[in-house]
Amino acid sequence: MSATRRTVASAGSIVVKIGSSALTSLVGGLDVGRLDALADAIEARMRAGSDVVVVSSGAVGAGLAPLGLTKRPRDLATKQAAASVGQLALAHAWGTSFARYGRTVGQVLLTADDIARRAQHRNAQRTLDRLRALHAVAIVNENDTVATAELRFGDNDRLAALVAHLVGADALVLLSDVDGLYDGDPRKGNATLIPEVNSPEDLDGVVAGSGGALGTGGMASKLSAARLAADAGVPVLLAAASDAGAALRDASVGTAFAARPSRLSARKFWVRHAADEQGILHIDEGAVRAVVTRRRSLLPAGITAVSGRFYGGDVVSLLGPEERPVARGVVAYDSAEISDILGKSTQELPAEMQRPVVHADDLVPL
């Protein structure tokens, strides 16, 4: 067994993400038998001594049949209506299932804004930590009923990776309708399972498709979530929901993704992955070398233009001469102030404006 699989198998704290297709029938509505089987596997892991946070998709899918809908809606309003009905059914089903073991569940609904803003980020973290301390099973989902198109995680794979970082999990397990990562389309019969991913190079040539009829998270989103978790120092196991028992017992199935050797600090992880960017700083080639290669602070002299309106403490994207993002960082000045000092050397500026525009400690190369 690989070191990554051993880490997942022995993890004391785990986030388990369960996709819509694992919980709902093809025509919509919850499949209680499948949900109970997943709860059984999670309960077994908790009895073995691990803390488990569940990120559960399925609210929209669970709301289809009660509303007389036969397929996943395309417009946001109908999706949110289905989610409002389905979320109630989903929470009740999880509560009923875990009640068989005398466990209490707590529902935690998050929007991207809750993760992007530091104050809400910390509050969500405290809530999840407290639920864990009280031995309740946290059932996390995106708050689909209020999340706008601009304030969405995109899919629950990304949400699960962010939650894994939020709670300091030792491992992330993604359970869906696929049994791992393949080097081609497994539906065509000539694809081979990739058991281990130890570096980005292992993904060369891998083609990732889109999601299924009842979900939004295809293989591309799972790979993105695995990379995100890797930055947080969290190994990932991707497996079929039907193999949940083995996945949570000994990590002997699916594809294992290794974490990066040195994890990003909590602040730098937030800057790179969780925070919404509020604007753009365009920088010259010399500044790109200073920021990316030498890991130096960004000074006014290297800035060529400012896009957007933002304030000191906001996160911005840094674009090089080719208009490609090269880093993200927390600015020390408002956009209007930066417009006044861009291109100038530090010596030309008054003492109160001689701080770096983005300090090296608040910069994350991409």
UniProtKB/Swiss-Prot annotation:
SMART domains linked to this entry: PUA (SM00359)
Location(s), subcellular: Cytoplasm
The name this protein goes by in its record: Glutamate 5-kinase
Record keywords: Amino-acid biosynthesis, ATP-binding, Cytoplasm, Kinase, Nucleotide-binding, Proline biosynthesis, Transferase
Class of the enzyme per the UniProt entry, highest EC level: transferase
GO cellular component terms, semicolon-separated: cytosol
Residues the entry annotates as binding ATP: 17, 176-177, 216-222
GO biological process, one term: L-proline biosynthetic process
Pathway per the UniProt entry: Amino-acid biosynthesis; L-proline biosynthesis; L-glutamate 5-semialdehyde from L-glutamate: step 1/2
Organism listed in the record: Rhodococcus opacus (strain B4)
GO MF annotations, alphabetized: ATP binding; glutamate 5-kinase activity; RNA binding
Classification lineage: Bacteria, Bacillati, Actinomycetota, Actinomycetes, Mycobacteriales
